[in-house]
């Protein structure tokens, strides 16, 4: 869930383009949730919604202008100081803009060899339940990201070497062949990624010539070195963290990258971006709902579209809990998860918007979500592997079932509860689910079904476009009540959530089309004759008028805007 989404966290996660609010009459009064959902539904139809909804020509035009705006000025006194070849190892940072590792590689050499390693472990199975580690939709998104990254590097005089294999085998071999003394890369925080860093470093040492791996921090809005406390003293409560960094930290300026980065060394075969079939993955086409376009250019295009073209940033706080349509939230999280855009770039675009248009609670709330994303990344360092354990960071003891049939009903959208089934249908069809939906389906799996929360977390890992381990597992531990903050133990009442966030049943009718012919008041409670039996009774409330115990809030606490597993807002 976390991910990020912005949650700003997703297997997830997050970025669906919903309704177009620029057609609404905007006043100083907050928009009611019912009016938002009605407008959202009016804009949705059976067609696929491309995100961003820009033509290829528009995406390219926006990208060119943005790259120029954020480029290192030609008049800058900064010059390259190093000699020889450096290797730039791309990981979850598939961008040119604000790429600290790229800048460091450029400034410390006279030749850069950019490399992406298609690690076969990425397409193995998850740790506990053997689900596909990378589903077809996220795999396809990744391939689009690589195509776009190569294109943007070539515009700057570079290229992208693509090799299939383990980085700890590929990178030392390349360092030896090209005489590179340093491999630059961005630092990751979770155990699988850190293990690969260790193996790469060991392999480079065996090359000799003092060859080394130099890791750069570049994945958060607030830099790790600027925190007002050691990361292992990170507050257990998000609000304490947020208030501390807002009061005591500055956000560094994004790194300006020169428009010309060449040359590259002579390479006989740069390698092709493979098809999913070559990676052993059956491709999947989006047949309904949101179809996200991978790559830095599309990510930059989405920021332009949401902030500037549709002017939706000013109403983000009022709409962020929507469920239907492409524009109720930013949908930046898939690009954040792959590092196609950086949180600092979004921060600077928010600042520009506040200067040129308006500054209000909505513009701040996007940053609020980015701080959540930072928090989960820092938390993954503090908690280590306990983030993946059943009892979570606090080693909470509980009774958890691993009933496979029950889990499959959740996974396959056959629980008998339309709100759950619609969300799970959207996830499997698009690779995305709203923040609100993620919180609801997590609560249902953990509290109503009593299932091991890791089953849900690993399925999100399979499906979400915006999956990243920090946000995903951070959000799931919170949702399961085993997270860092002992106050996180919330139940989401399905009747209450349906009433508050899909009052007309438009969302469930969009994803479960057999419900569309029913009266709106019946769509969430169609009965077994019109729908199917429910697989479990609800812990709290079994009818349309039922309330809920401790329902409401978000995975992240009392802030209902918290992004389930997203990587961004």
Swiss-Prot record:
SUPFAM superfamilies documented for this protein: Cryptochrome/photolyase FAD-binding domain, Cryptochrome/photolyase, N-terminal domain
Cell wall biogenesis/degradation listed as a keyword: no
Cellular component annotations (GO), alphabetically ordered: chloroplast; mitochondrion
Binding site for FAD: 316, 329-333, 466, 468
Region (Disordered): 541-569
PROSITE patterns: PHR_CRY_ALPHA_BETA (PS51645)
Cofactor(s) the record lists: FAD; (6R)-5,10-methylene-5,6,7,8-tetrahydrofolate
Residue span, Photolyase/cryptochrome alpha/beta domain: 84-221
GO BP annotation list: photoreactive repair
Basic residues bias: start-end ranges: 559-569
Name of the protein described by the UniProt record: Cryptochrome DASH, chloroplastic/mitochondrial
Protein's organism: Arabidopsis thaliana
